[in-house]
Amino acid sequence: MLNEFKEFIARGNVMDLAVGVIIGAAFSKIVDSVVNDLVMPVVGAITGGGFDFSNYFLPLSASVTAPTLSAAREQGAVFAYGNFITVLINFLILAWIIFLLIKLVNRARASVERDKAPDPAAPPPQDILLLSEIRDLLRQRA
């Protein structure tokens, strides 16, 4: 059973998946930075400044009166939809970037396939040529 597990782990697909997960985790930090440091300030400038989704919430009890999400969570239950909006924006940006990368890779593959000329047919081996000549001579005698 241990040997089967080793074979399973050593397969290329499992290793590729592991590398993809690690790179994806690192890439998600880049997307978070793009959203929080580049996109959200632009959205804030368009909507009148100071626009921040993180403090958007609905109190689920009457005891919640705080203006910020962290303080409201200390007072009671809240429906923090602002964080969801931020995560949704992160996902959409990540999905768009992955779509563009896949499109770029597919275009590069198609270009390589288009530029690739078919290999010329290799000449037949010497023994095949000799056998063909013998066949032709036998046909001429008959």
Swiss-Prot record:
GO terms for MF: mechanosensitive monoatomic ion channel activity
GO cellular component: plasma membrane
Localization: Cell inner membrane
Topological relation to the membrane, as annotated: Multi-pass membrane protein
Assembly behavior: Homopentamer.
InterPro entries per UniProt: Mechanosensitive_channel_CS, MS_channel, MSC/AndL, MscL_channel
Family: Belongs to the MscL family.
Name the UniProt record assigns to this protein: Large-conductance mechanosensitive channel
Keywords: Cell inner membrane, Cell membrane, Ion channel, Ion transport, Membrane, Transmembrane, Transmembrane helix, Transport
Encoding gene (name): mscL
Any single Pfam family the record assigns to this protein: MscL
Cysteines engaged in disulfide bonds, as pairs: none
Membrane-spanning parts: 14-34, 38-58, 82-102
PROSITE patterns found in the cross-reference section: MSCL
Taxonomy, superkingdom: Bacteria
Record's function text: Channel that opens in response to stretch forces in the membrane lipid bilayer. May participate in the regulation of osmotic pressure changes within the cell.
